[in-house]
């Protein structure tokens, strides 16, 4: 199951968007064009659905409803709608939520509405009679309420299992993995990465590490082996061995290059995610020759397992892959008022004709994604 369409109204700089999504999605646009805000739609839904989350915390950590809505003082609140399905039926599920401010000083988020559809049939429609008789119920979604979401639990699980990969790996140390791991979630991404590795059964962990090891042997000169070592004090860390290194001596993760650590974490995320995986500029710190193969690598690693990959990129090398279809690329087009619209690259005039003529998707969309005055940098003094 994947997200087949996402809609947003008054969300950050996305005033009104509705865009279809494929199993792979490449989000392309200028700096501050709305790509991260687009990914944050999925993070927001995840943070409502995940255990220990909820509407209030998801809104407040983003500065409140006023910080999230695009046009403060014009329209109160924001709205999000996602449709989920598969190849046979693209609308198996749909979830819609509208949020506005309420309370003293209008500080608290409450529901304008919450709706769930299953196979086109509406199974949740709030506010209902109980909400109208007790408005405080609108401070909590059914999505976060385990006693109220039994009828759409697969949707809850799907949202809760979405993963965002955007961390910078520098400063990654050995990880104390025994005890309460939940405290690390969302606060220290590098430690959360090691936590994720330790959370899976040993046979699965070893299998994934061997696959990552095989990729590293192809792209990192003289690379020989990747291992997860347990240290004293219930700590673990990644270690590598190189052909040119001192015989038998292992290089700890603190001494890995940033590109190596980033590639390891991206590969682990691709192998482990079965819901939506969000990758923010995966090309960072990677050699262009590696970046060129990322789209194909994503396709091959994900083709035999469920899930969807949505990534943002500025990279011509990544978008040069001939296997990328124009329908997989969504283009962010800022307007003069600070907002942005989104459209599939396949809807660009003459896009398919240019691709059929031999241009890559990147050559078609990247010139349209640059800032309107960027050429003036050549005259800046």
Regions found by a protein language model. Give the residues of each.
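Conserved P-loop NTP-binding catalytic core
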Residues: 40-105
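P-loop (Walker A) phosphate-binding loop of NTP-binding proteins
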Residues: 11, 30, 282
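N-terminal pre-Walker A segment at the start of P-loop NTPase domains
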Residues: 1-15
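Conserved catalytic network of the ASCE P-loop NTPase/AAA+ motor domain
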Residues: 73, 88, 269-272, 300-305, ...
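Phosphate-binding glycine-rich loops of NTP-binding sites
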Residues: 23-62, 263-272, 296-297, 312, ...
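Electropositive, glycine-dotted interaction segments
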Residues: 88-227
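C-terminal lobe/lid and adjacent interdomain/linker elements of RecA-like ASCE P-loop ATPase modules
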Residues: 293-381
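Conserved ABC ATPase signature
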Residues: 217-271, 276-289
């Amino acid at each position: 199951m994947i997200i087949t369409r996402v809609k947003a109204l008054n969300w950050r700089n996305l005033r009104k968007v509705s865009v279809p999504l494929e199993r792979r999605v490449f989000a392309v646009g200028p700096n501050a064009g709305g790509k991260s805000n687009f990914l944050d739609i999925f993070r927001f839904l995840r943070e409502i659905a995940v255990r220990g989350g909820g509407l209030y915390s998801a809104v407040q950590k983003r500065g409140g409803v006023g910080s999230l809505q695009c046009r403060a003082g014009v329209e109160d609140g924001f709205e999000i709608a996602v449709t989920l399905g598969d190849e046979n039926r693209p609308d198996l599920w749909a979830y819609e939520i509208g949020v506005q401010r309420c309370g003293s000083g209008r500080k608290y988020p409450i529901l304008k509405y919450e709706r769930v559809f299953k196979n086109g049939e509406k199974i949740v429609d709030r506010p209902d009679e109980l909400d109208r008789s007790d408005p405080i119920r609108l401070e909590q979604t059914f999505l976060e309420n385990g006693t109220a979401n039994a009828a759409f639990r697969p949707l809850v699980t799907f949202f809760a299992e979405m993963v965002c990969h955007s961390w910078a790996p520098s400063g990654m140390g050995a990880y104390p993995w025994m005890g309460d791991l939940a405290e690390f979630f969302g606060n220290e991404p590098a430690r959360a990465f090691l936590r994720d590795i330790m959370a899976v059964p040993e046979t699965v962990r070893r299998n994934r590490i061997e696959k990552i090891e095989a990729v590293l042997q192809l792209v990192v000169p003289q690379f020989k082996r990747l291992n997860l070592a347990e240290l004293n004090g219930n700590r673990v860390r990644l270690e590598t061995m190189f052909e040119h290194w001192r015989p038998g001596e292992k290089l700890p993760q603190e001494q890995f290059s940033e590109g190596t650590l980033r590639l390891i974490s991206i590969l682990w995320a691709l192998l482990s995610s079965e819901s939506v995986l969000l990758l923010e500029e995966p090309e960072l710190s990677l050699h262009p020759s590696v970046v060129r193969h990322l789209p194909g690598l994503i396709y091959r690693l994900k083709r035999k397992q469920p899930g969807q990959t949505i990534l943002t990129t500025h990279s011509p090398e990544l978008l040069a892959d001939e296997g990328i279809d124009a329908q997989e690329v969504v283009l962010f087009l800022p307007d003069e008022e600070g907002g942005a619209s989104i459209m599939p690259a396949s809807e660009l005039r003459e896009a398919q004709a240019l691709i059929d003529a031999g241009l890559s998707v990147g050559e078609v969309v990247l010139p349209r994604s640059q800032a309107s005055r960027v050429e003036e940098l050549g005259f800046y003094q």
